[in-house]
């Protein structure tokens, strides 16, 4: 129930991606990217809706061809979540999706072309009030920078980003955010640190091509956790070779662990040992599965014995401490007379957790209306 984070966010300007504020103290937005063929309109819409269901604030869609741009038009009309069009190589695609109501344009300095092409995109974005993301990637730096630095370095990623920041500055266009992604944690972290000292625009965080679900989640948590703990970052994407829905879940889990932004239940559970009075692992797994739909931020501790159980329960909204045959139940730190039969823990806990989630949601609603 410790709700306040000690982290002080880096000051930044604010932009809007659709109706989602980015920067200047706004909640850190969690986004993902579709991995369907964009021309498969039905599959892409279905995936976007699945992402929206688990809390995605923004969804990025690759638009590699003009056919994909035409598909994007239909997709945009069919979903509610703001969409970012991911544009590489052909700047004319950016102009086309701008006509179709895109909420943000992501361009890659390494392949979008010369300043004249960038100018065309910027003028279009200005006319239609569309923000831009300058998306630098260690795997696609400009050739002259690779010749200069020999390999991706923090200085190379920074120089690539600043070239295009300078172009936008000269054009008096300030509605943009920047990313300097790399697949190496230290390269990405140092690149973002350097960039954060140079500009005031919002920063989009990511460890690019992080890997599969397990390793990629760990790598992203380490890298983004370092930056977020320093107050750096205004929006993020977890890049996993996995179902994009998992990217959203991991993104919120990282923010939740730093108490920056919470969505859903924070389960505090012991790894279990021979002292456990019930099967902790199966209990937690089943509760996580059943309660995925709960969006209210709350802490639930599931501890298998009395060594740490009472202490964790004191700082949880709902706490369970393992006991012989029956386990102790806590509500907001207070031990209750009611005890739960260890053979029926999941059903009993689910009911209590859902009731507490509703109570907390109502409490927040009342607070909002009285302030």
UniProtKB/Swiss-Prot annotation:
Q: Which residues bind [4Fe-4S] cluster?
A: 270, 273, 305, 312
Enzyme class, UniProt record, top EC level: oxidoreductase
Please give the pathway this protein is involved in.
Answer: Isoprenoid biosynthesis; isopentenyl diphosphate biosynthesis via DXP pathway; isopentenyl diphosphate from 1-deoxy-D-xylulose 5-phosphate: step 5/6
Q: Which reaction does it catalyse?
A: (2E)-4-hydroxy-3-methylbut-2-enyl diphosphate + oxidized [flavodoxin] + H2O + 2 H(+) = 2-C-methyl-D-erythritol 2,4-cyclic diphosphate + reduced [flavodoxin]
Gene Ontology BP term (one): terpenoid biosynthetic process
What's noted on cofactor binding?
A: Binds 1 [4Fe-4S] cluster.
Q: Which UniProt keywords apply?
A: 4Fe-4S, Iron, Iron-sulfur, Isoprene biosynthesis, Metal-binding, Oxidoreductase
* Record-listed E.C. numbers: 1.17.7.3
An example of a GO molecular function for this protein is: 4-hydroxy-3-methylbut-2-en-1-yl diphosphate synthase activity (ferredoxin)
Organism's domain of life?
A: Bacteria
Q: Which Pfam family, just one, is annotated for this protein?
A: GcpE
Essential cofactor(s): [4Fe-4S] cluster
Q: Does the keyword S-adenosyl-L-methionine apply?
A: no
What function is annotated for this protein? Converts 2C-methyl-D-erythritol 2,4-cyclodiphosphate (ME-2,4cPP) into 1-hydroxy-2-methyl-2-(E)-butenyl 4-diphosphate.
Report the family membership: Belongs to the IspG family.
Q: PANTHER family in the record, alphabetically?
A: 4-HYDROXY-3-METHYLBUT-2-EN-1-YL DIPHOSPHATE SYNTHASE, 4-HYDROXY-3-METHYLBUT-2-EN-1-YL DIPHOSPHATE SYNTHASE (FERREDOXIN), CHLOROPLASTIC
Protein name per the record: 4-hydroxy-3-methylbut-2-en-1-yl diphosphate synthase (flavodoxin)
What is the species listed in this Swiss-Prot or TrEMBL entry? Answer: Shewanella sp. (strain W3-18-1)
This chain is encoded by the gene named ispG
